[in-house]
């Protein structure tokens, strides 16, 4: 497990928080200073907590645990899919989180089965045999299901660990994880609540380079744990 050093965190802009007036006071212990009305995060703590998160996911992966990556914002969407696909036991949601994806698991499984059925029909040329209107409706349904469920299509059970980008945006996902007792690891910007996650990683959750650096580190640890 290769640790990320402070220079790498600094170079990726992980230390930049939000404007001071947007802060959550619970993030105070992780804030180093304030510059030009912008909170600056303490990268020493970020490095320590990232190391803890890496050890946790590596151990979980070695035990055969599964991971769900969640990040639907523009800056995170592509990286979430890219990193999750590197994990033998990784799944992802990188478009809209559908309420009940975890807490209403039976319904989600039925939607996944519908997605697989439509994909099979597409491969077998069934759409071409249908009336034009019906074929168009099924094609649109397939496109929509792929957009929202492609990353969890092969997830046969609830995930063991969730890795979430942007707590404020993904609050529904976090609440579902908490309700089900699924541990949450999350990059927390200065406007977040560390009490809602199991392992907080203080960091800039808006910059692509920051998100990519941290996710890549976590994924590397998962891959190592699977070996």
Curated annotation (Swiss-Prot):
GO terms for molecular function: structural constituent of ribosome. InterPro entries: Ribosomal_uS2, Ribosomal_uS2_bac/mit/plastid, Ribosomal_uS2_CS, Ribosomal_uS2_flav_dom_sf. Its main location: plastid. It is found in: Plastid, Chloroplast. The keyword Plastid applies. GO terms for cellular component: chloroplast; mitochondrial small ribosomal subunit. One of its GO terms (biological process) is translation. The keyword Ribonucleoprotein applies. Pfam families: Ribosomal_S2. It comes from the Eukaryota. Keywords: Chloroplast, Plastid, Ribonucleoprotein, Ribosomal protein. SUPFAM superfamilies: Ribosomal protein S2. PANTHER family: 30S RIBOSOMAL PROTEIN S2 PROKARYOTIC AND ORGANELLAR, SMALL RIBOSOMAL SUBUNIT PROTEIN US2M. HAMAP family: Ribosomal_uS2_B. Belongs to the universal ribosomal protein uS2 family. This is Small ribosomal subunit protein uS2c. It comes from Thalassiosira pseudonana. The lineage of its organism: Eukaryota, Sar, Stramenopiles, Ochrophyta, Bacillariophyta.
């Amino acid at each position: 497990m290769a640790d990320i050093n402070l220079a790498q965190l600094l170079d990726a802009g992980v230390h930049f928080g939000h404007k001071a007036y947007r802060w959550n006071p619970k993030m105070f212990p992780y804030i180093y200073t304030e510059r030009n009305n912008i909170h600056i995060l303490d990268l020493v703590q970020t490095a320590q907590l990232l190391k803890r998160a890496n050890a946790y996911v590596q151990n979980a992966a070695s035990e055969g645990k599964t991971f769900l990556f969640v990040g639907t914002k523009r800056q995170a969407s592509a990286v979430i899919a890219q990193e999750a696909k590197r994990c033998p036991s990784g799944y992802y949601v990188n478009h809209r989180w559908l309420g009940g994806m975890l807490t209403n698991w039976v319904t989600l499984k039925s939607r996944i089965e519908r997605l697989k059925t439509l994909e099979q029909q597409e491969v077998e040329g069934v759409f071409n045999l249908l009336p034009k209107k019906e074929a168009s409706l099924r094609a649109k349904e397939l496109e929509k299901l792929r957009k929202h469920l492609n990353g969890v299509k092969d997830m046969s059970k609830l995930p063991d660990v969730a890795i979430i980008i942007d707590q404020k945006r993904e609050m529904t996902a976090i609440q579902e994880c908490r309700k089900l007792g699924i541990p949450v690891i999350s990059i927390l910007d200065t406007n977040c609540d560390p009490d809602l996650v199991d392992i907080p990683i203080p960091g800039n959750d808006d910059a692509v380079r920051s998100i990519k650096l941290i996710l890549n580190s976590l994924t590397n640890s998962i891959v190592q744990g699977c070996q």
